Amino acid sequence: MTTDDLAFDKRHIWHPYTSMTSPLPVYPVERAEGCELVLASGKRLIEGMSSWWAAIHGYNHPQLNAAMKAQIDAMSHVMFGGITHQPAVNLCRKLVAITPEPLECVFLADSGSVSVEVAMKMALQYWQARGESRQRFLTFRHGYHGDTFGAMSVCDPDNSMHSLWKGYLPENLFAPAPQSRMDGEWDESDIAPFARLMAAHRHEIAAVILEPIVQGAGGMRIYHPQWLRRIRNMCDREGILLIADEIATGFGRTGKLFACEHAGIAPDILCLGKALTGGTMTLSATLTTRQVAETISNGEAGCFMHGPTFMGNPLACAVACANLTLLESGEWRQQVASIESQLRAELAPAQSSPWVADVRVLGAIGVVETTHPVNMAALQRFFVGQGVWIRPFGKLIYLMPPYIIRPDQLRRLTQAVNDAVHNETFFSH
């Protein structure tokens, strides 16, 4: 990549959550292999983000590459309206087999945010078909569900990336974020505000939507499984649907194939994305029960009113099937358990820094929450200098490495985090 290319990028290309007047620096990557990104300079960076939590098997995995190459020769895309194909059937068969019962109807879409939009539309259309006007969603503060309009309406309205849009979005119901931690005791009083909100608005609520066990980009909080059990019971009692957004947590990230398994519950609607294709292509899936699907289909519209152009893309479905085949081997369980053990041991020293508020770990997730926002540009430059790729935001420095990472590579990541949090120059104060 030339200097001219980088100048063009800076002038014309809008990167995620980046200013066009004072953009953060970008680092040109030429290729990626295993757990490493190779910069144009030849410098290698150990990958700590799994490309926003998606590349669970690392990069250039031979089985995933082979699946894509074979599918390209047959058919890279075809519309899904009035047509079906083997990769979609194979993928949906696998998804129905591995997700909790009674989820059995699958809607394929483009991205995680769209999966959430689809789930919300399913819930709204379900109640419309039943002749009830339920138009609101109940969720937690500090939640994050995506950047599209409906998804933004169930993100924290005050403490998130979407507070700018308050007043424009539909007004949903927000309970305080869970305080009972995964590694602590369950406090029954923790759920009281949530229960009061549900009781007060039970005839308005179409669904509860939440990120099970781990709240992702809204704060990386890890909460007690009893929350999910109690909410499942409340939803059953009130006849309210439960949507589990497992876009970040699905496919083994928390040590269980799906985070709902920590509580032994099943949602009425399940959102999947990110790691669905092993981080190779964009694809998402929204699963629901036969009862929800048939209620929608028997309503006035006679069908579910959604249909993306690239729905069921054969290339994405083929590589997603290969990804699930890799997961079926079960090797990921030991990999994630080993990562968790190493993260717990090696991030513990960060707690001694005066700039650190909390350290938390679950599965292949390690989070260091700081007392002050980090200086993003300076800290990113430091990490690249250390030969690691870690992308912090706000007060969070976190690791979500590929499951195939070696202990020595993970040690480089944790050492870089420990060095950073003991250096006050990286914090705004």
Curated annotation (Swiss-Prot):
Site (Participates in the substrate recognition with KAPA and in a stacking interaction with the adenine ring of SAM): 17
Gene Ontology CC annotations of this record: cytoplasm
E.C. no: 2.6.1.62
Catalytic reactions of this protein: (8S)-8-amino-7-oxononanoate + S-adenosyl-L-methionine = S-adenosyl-4-methylsulfanyl-2-oxobutanoate + (7R,8S)-7,8-diammoniononanoate
Record PROSITE patterns: AA_TRANSFER_CLASS_3
Gene Ontology biological process terms, A to Z: biotin biosynthetic process
Cellular localisation: Cytoplasm
Major place of residence: cytoplasm
Single Gene Ontology MF annotation: pyridoxal phosphate binding
Oligomer status and interactors: Homodimer.
Protein name listed in UniProt: Adenosylmethionine-8-amino-7-oxononanoate aminotransferase
UniProt source species: Salmonella typhimurium (strain LT2 / SGSC1412 / ATCC 700720)
